[in-house]
């Protein structure tokens, strides 16, 4: 909800106020952390540089990072350009901001639901959540082609619901793998997964930019869907490898 809220503040006042708002929220977070975070938390040990080698020579962990990058990043091929997509459907700039705020609420709901799903079987849950995300991206693409504002609005909110539903599962899966294969490097593996999230954002946004330059912004959702599909293939591959290993044992 932060991005659309910042956009709304900037449009209603001045763009400088968005940064003041961000700084204010950061200050509140800093003060809250100082008073609310326990002072007696255990201090983690130093990161072992050799852990990098252990992590990146572990096939399941490497694939988990790729799943994170593609599964999370595909959304941004469309989300980065959601405003012009909505404007092309006839929504005003003010209406787009309101839609994005509601989109943010849908993201929060999706995150919560995704966390519950991921608690059981992360890999199976990721396949379902990625599939729903792909369907929402395809639906958005079709509604834009149809130039149907009502369906486009529905598709955008569906995208918000499914876009980041996978985040808890992606992080949980990496932690589970780290506990299994490199228990001494769990913190480092988690950090690399966060890096994979950001790489995914970069790749997805750049893909959307290239598509917009060479084709049209209309096609960004379908290309985002293809990126997420790559993540699904990786998940299916890893799941098959795990099943074969379990059968062998």
Segments and roles (model prediction):
Residues 57-77, 157-161:
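Pair of pore-lining "gating" transmembrane helices in MFS-fold secondary transporters
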Residues 124-170:
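C-terminal transmembrane helical hairpin of 12-TM major facilitator-type secondary transporters
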